[in-house]
């Protein structure tokens, strides 16, 4: 077991069980005695033992859905998934629980909060200053992913608010389609291209993606459907969405961005303010699977934990 090769300590415990009346899927629960949240560990073991499900055909995804049946309209991920043994070992040492499911190359890490998407194992393969820069860049890009297009739409609806040094962001060409419809159509079109790329044979994925991007981008602007500025900002948002490791968090940001766009279009400044408040409340009132704040250490505030989350510190040693 690759985790055992990194943590050769008797306190590193692995408990095996099964779930699924038909599949009898093997499940391993890994944790570190003395560091794990005992209440959470007890809850997880009880839920797995009492789980009544026909089969876990989708492996850890099926198990995650059974362990935490949150409301369908809540897109925020409660688990992290990783295929890296170093990430799993580090998470165990931090007091987290690792769940391994048979036939799956990845592990489940819990509990998980919004700030876990900011951290990546690669940060610790660089010097502290570089790791801190990458972490802060990841956070900044994630915020831009959420607010860039709604804020730009707000400024386009109120051009008198644009300072002289930002006049270049205004649309130079004539608009044939309202901006809000351009942005919403592109939101769905990008997902359509992504789905097409997934289902395209691997040897054709790269050339077809390049051709589709160039042809659709060029002729959609020339035909008057979209303005070049709209294409630019949506292209940035699409690429920036991959700056954080969690695929589920990327879609959560996308859903909040669409809500912000619609509210800003309908109610102008008050829509933007209300949408921002709604997004903040949606994150702030979320709970992890352990029942703690989803945005800890901001709420409740802890300066020492904030420093650990935002800055890549040196490895403690003597």
Where are these regions (language model features)?
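Cytosolic regulatory modules rich in charged/polar residues
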Residues: 1-179, 289-317
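Short glycine/serine/threonine/alanine-rich loop segments
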Residues: 97, 225, 269
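Hydrophobic alpha-helical transmembrane segments of membrane transport and translocation systems
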Residues: 228-230, 234-318
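Transmembrane alpha-helical segments that form the functional core of multipass membrane systems
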Residues: 106, 112-260
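Short polybasic/polar patches that bind polyanions
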Residues: 8, 49, 194, 221, ...
């Amino acid at each position: 077991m690759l985790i055992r090769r990194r943590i050769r300590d008797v306190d590193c415990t692995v408990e095996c069980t099964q779930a699924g009346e038909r599949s009898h899927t093997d499940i391993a629960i890994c944790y570190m005695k003395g560091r794990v949240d005992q209440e959470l560990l007890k809850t997880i073991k009880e839920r797995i033992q009492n789980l009544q499900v026909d089969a876990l055909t989708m492996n850890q995804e099926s198990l995650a859905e059974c362990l935490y049946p949150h409301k369908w309209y809540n897109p925020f991920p409660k688990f992290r998934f990783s295929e890296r043994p170093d990430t799993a070992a580090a998470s165990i040492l931090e007091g987290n629980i690792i769940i391994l499911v048979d036939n799956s190359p990845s592990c489940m890490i819990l509990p998980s909060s919004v700030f876990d998407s900011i951290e990546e194992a690669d940060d610790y393969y660089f010097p502290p200053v570089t790791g801190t820069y990458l972490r802060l860049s990841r956070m900044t890009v994630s915020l831009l992913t959420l607010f860039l297009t709604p804020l730009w739409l707000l400024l386009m609806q109120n051009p008198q608010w644009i300072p002289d040094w930002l006049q270049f962001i205004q649309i130079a060409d004539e608009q044939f389609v309202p901006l809000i419809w351009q942005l919403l159509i592109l939101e769905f079109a990008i997902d359509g291209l992504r789905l097409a790329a997934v289902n395209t044979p691997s040897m054709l994925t790269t050339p077809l993606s390049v051709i589709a991007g160039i042809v659709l981008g060029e002729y959609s602007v020339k035909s008057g459907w979209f303005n070049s500025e709209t294409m630019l900002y949506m292209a940035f948002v699409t690429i920036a969405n991959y700056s954080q490791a969690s695929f589920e968090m990327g879609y959560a940001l996308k859903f909040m961005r669409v809500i912000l766009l619609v509210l800003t279009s309908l109610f102008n400044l008050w829509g933007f303010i209300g949408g921002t408040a709604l997004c903040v409340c949606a994150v702030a009132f979320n709970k992890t699977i352990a029942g703690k704040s989803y945005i800890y250490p901001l709420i409740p505030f802890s300066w020492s934990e904030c420093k650990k989350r935002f800055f890549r510190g040196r490895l403690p040693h003597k």
